[in-house]
Amino acid sequence: MPQTIAHRKLGQGLEVSALGLGCMGMSWAYTPTESNEGEAVIARAIELGVTFFDTAEIYGPFENEKLLGRAIRGKRDGLVIATKFGFKLENGKNVGVDSSPANLKRVCDEALGRLGIESIDLFYQHRVDPNVPIEETVGAMAELK
């Protein structure tokens, strides 16, 4: 994988390309794109040395993680995949926030399947849930290691 882009360390050592690719707009929020267009953009980013890709279950919902998963299949080595939790979805619709331990563990398990990977490199909270103490959320995240 060419490294034409500078790299940075996040936190205690996770190395990412200084330029990351947020994939949200490939399947949600902006002008709709065809899945193969998004996959082509991701493939080209990898060719250029981008290693950091961000998605979330809310994007699509679910479709963005699937798109990224298809695009990185067979190319996972050296990539850093980030996804997020924190929304409550019912029948594919956002109905509020939910950062409860049960929800974040469910989101993690389901995201692994949609992405087609064995581990998520960066899993973080998309929105603060005022009904769940942050200590409970962070404690549940620590259990995922």
Predicted regions and their residues:
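Active-site beta-loop-alpha junctions enriched in small/polar residues
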Residues: 24-26, 56-58, 84-88, 125-128
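Structural motif corresponding to the early beta-alpha repeats
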Residues: 74-101
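Glycine/proline-rich, positively charged
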Residues: 91-145
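Conserved catalytic core of Hanks-type protein kinase domains
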Residues: 45, 84, 114
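Hydrophobic positions in alpha-helices of CheY-like receiver
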Residues: 72, 85, 141-144
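N-terminal binding-site loop/beta-alpha segment at the start of enzyme catalytic domains
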Residues: 1-80
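Generic enzyme active-site microenvironment
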Residues: 52-55, 82, 119, 124
